[in-house]
Amino acid sequence: MSSHSESSIATVITALQDTEAFRAQVTAHQHRQLAGNTPPWQGTGLKLEAGQHYSVFASGRIQWSRRHPDLHGGPRFHLWARVAPGGAIVNLRQDTDSFIADHSGELELGIYMGMWQNDRGDLASDLAAYARLEGALEVSLLIWRGTASGGLAALLAAGADHAALSAELKHLEHPQTPPPGWSYLVEAGQAEIYRQAETDKDQPCIHLTGADEQGIIVREVDFPLTPDTRISWRWQVDQHPSEVPEDTPYTHDYVSVAAEFEDGRDLTWIWSSSLPPGHHFACPIKAWSARETHFVVRSGANEFGQWVAESRPVYADVAAAIGPPPARIVRIWLIVVATFQHGSFDASVAEITLHDGAQRLQVL
């Protein structure tokens, strides 16, 4: 087969659909366009059985603002799927991804902009946010008879030639999962940012690296929040995703350690590119502003490339930045965002500890 490397994945799939190899591997396929200004969910008419594999290939851009042309996102930011009724939502970790249906039902697709209410795909945020979105995503779907990896390998062996097919097979053969004990926060989606690593002293740490991505991993804890409660950690930032203040909705790219409290709110301690230590602000993103507050604990690039220790009085920081502190800490978060200015980041975090004099909890 001649090379289709310059063709769209939809064109390649259309060319393959009548081949014996394609019919042997694929039960159904579809190409569709999702307009950015259409809230979720959109039915595809494709039926899946629980346990069936499917792959999603997407391209395109959703523009968030005419006044700010640099504000936009692609499939990794916006495209989600679910099997309805009853299935959990999933998102693309790359511009291609593959999934296993957790329920039997219809495959649905959705453009995400705002805040999920739950992991079934109900939106908590206002649908009005969609009215200003422009652009669209082009989506191709393959429903497999067997495994996604087996189907992709068979198509490639039969002569199918497209970078997206090869990339997705490689993606499946080399999965990147979050560090043990940590999971991605549903509202921010799955990613491939964080991995278990070691410091130069052979101590366990979490390394985060990427470009034009975002992700939050969380670890469940149960720790009292008293005037004596402190959170300590060490971190090293080698590349920061922002070079300007992060407290605007156009430049909100940052690295942070955070604590979530029993009331659902969270306080994130950030290493800012340029805001002064002690500065705190509500998240400038509307869907997050009532939930999340940022507190600058370190600033500037002078200490990039070296391990730096932090220790924060959680109760006092909450009282200063949010208000009356709740009674308990329920999760610790690691956060990185680089989707506003589309920059790169490289950092590591180690030795996260909660302690209050009476007890000590080693989180990492």
Regions found by a protein language model. Give the residues of each.
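Secreted extracellular polysaccharide-interacting domains
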Residues: 40, 205-227, 240-242, 292-296
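Extracellular/lumenal carbohydrate-interaction signature centered on repeated Trp-anchored short motifs
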Residues: 46-49, 220-231, 301-304
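Extracellular polysaccharide-targeting segments
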Residues: 144-161, 265-285, 304, 338-364
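Acidic, Ser/Thr/Pro
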Residues: 1-169, 177-178, 250-252, 273-284
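Extracellular beta-strand ligand-recognition surfaces/modules
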Residues: 109, 119-126, 249-257, 291-300, ...
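Short carbohydrate-recognition loop motifs
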Residues: 26-31, 84-85, 191-217
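Extracellular ligand-binding interfaces
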Residues: 80-81, 238-306, 345-348
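Solvent-exposed strand-to-loop "edge" motifs in beta-rich extracellular domains
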Residues: 59-61, 112-114, 234-240, 262, ...
